[in-house]
Amino acid sequence: MNSPIEKLTRQLGYQFQDDELLNLALTHRSANSKHNERLEFLGDSILSFVIADELYHRFPKVNEGDMSRMRATLVRGNTLAELGREFGLGDYLKLGPGELKSGGFRRDSILADAVEAIIGAVYLDSDLEVVRGIVLNWYASRLEAIKPGVSQKDPKTRLQEFLQGRRKPLPVYTVTNIKGEAHNQEFTVECDIAGMDKPVVGRGTSRRKAEQAAAELALEQLTNG
């Protein structure tokens, strides 16, 4: 293996017996007719099973509805994309010229798909018990943080419900700045809430993410203040 891939395998916590499986997992359909979508399909199912099995045993008294909500939070695209960024996957993806130009290596959907493809590749390179250990290691902090009965709703929804429950006006979100090129922008959003001294500022790679970041900070201030 060359040095960059060795760095990635250290991040993943797994040394492949068949390097070609990892190469395939990192190959987007825009780059080659042999790409990672079949591995992604396999990895998606394995991830769902491993997380469901872990939640079932970790929370023996929790009902199906809560477990489903927790699993959905853990396996959704933005969680997988966060994992991909933690591994630095964008530096290793094989993309076609169009995707490279448009910043595909930063796109949540491409990063999430690659994480699922790597899970599928690890399974084919080893077995279910090995891939279970790898996935649970990746998810250790998230599994510790997630709680049954706690709303898995996004911050904007939780903030809206918090304010409605106290008969307060809904927040007003305003984009105050956008910087960077079209495929690599940073949005700054102010969240104005009646009764707060000043707006709460959030930033993100899209307007939605910046609004969610601002809502999360506003919730922290409202609940801790």
From Swiss-Prot:
One of its GO terms (cellular component) is cytoplasm. It is found in: Cytoplasm. Its EC number is 3.1.26.3. Keywords: Cytoplasm, Endonuclease, Hydrolase, Magnesium, Metal-binding, mRNA processing, Nuclease, RNA-binding, rRNA processing, rRNA-binding, tRNA processing. Its cofactor is Mg(2+). Residues 154-224 form the DRBM domain. Mg(2+) binds at E40, D113, E116. One of its GO terms (biological process) is tRNA processing. HAMAP family: RNase_III (MF_00104). Belongs to the ribonuclease III family. Homodimer. This is Ribonuclease 3.
